[in-house]
Amino acid sequence: RPGRFDRQIIVPLPESDERLAILKVHSIGKRMGQDVDLDTMAKATPGMSGADLANLVNEAALFAVRRGSTHIERIDFENARDRVVLGASRESLVLNAEEKRATAYHEGGHAVLATVLPHSDPLHKVTILPRGMALGVTWTLPAERHTYSREFFEDVICKAMGGRVAEMMVFGSLNSGAANDLEQATGIARRMVREWGMSDAVGPMAWSGQQQVFLGEDLMTSGREYSDETARKIDEEIGRILLEQEK
């Protein structure tokens, strides 16, 4: 609180160049294979702290030991990153042939859109090996950005919808596998409309939904800063964005 400390030091998470430097430090003394590209791994680990990156290198070394190798290869870093971010592989999970096929087409839908959309981050890896709660994952290499355009968010939503659309095109029906994609897409569309002023119909207004009084929302109000008409318009705009990007 004010008065106890005169200086407030903000330590942000490392960016790509800084992550590369951290990975190099923790790789000292470890034998690296010829295919290891720490620069690519630095780009593929946004949001990781220095401790996370140290753990990543240690996990990669453990994967190499389990393979009986004297060198850490690229596959070890990939497996380590998947484990740190998603969790351990679920070898006990047995999918039937139809589920594997659906997962493959689902991730393929994401991958195709990541490749062709002009504002999407470049495709890095696609897997249908179950890890954590995911049956498959499509990885991209995000650029270091500090501001984001409406077109970028639209492409993120479109890519999220890609798995669902691919399943519909191939199987003619939908399943519950797109739940996380829909949650991500809806969350982005909601913030585009409510917080970032990216809806022409609603206009340049922002409602974060985080303004609360002491001990919770003011009991004398509904906790909402806008009218029922505006709420209806917001819902319509969120739905419009999602449907447009699904097409």
Predicted segments with their positions:
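Short, glycine/charged-enriched secondary-structure capping and boundary segments
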Residues: 1-3, 24, 118, 141
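A short helix-turn-beta junction within AAA+ P-loop NTPase domains corresponding to the substrate/partner-engaging
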Residues: 1-11
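Alpha-helical architecture
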Residues: 47, 104-105
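Soluble catalytic regions of large protease machineries
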Residues: 102-104, 111-247
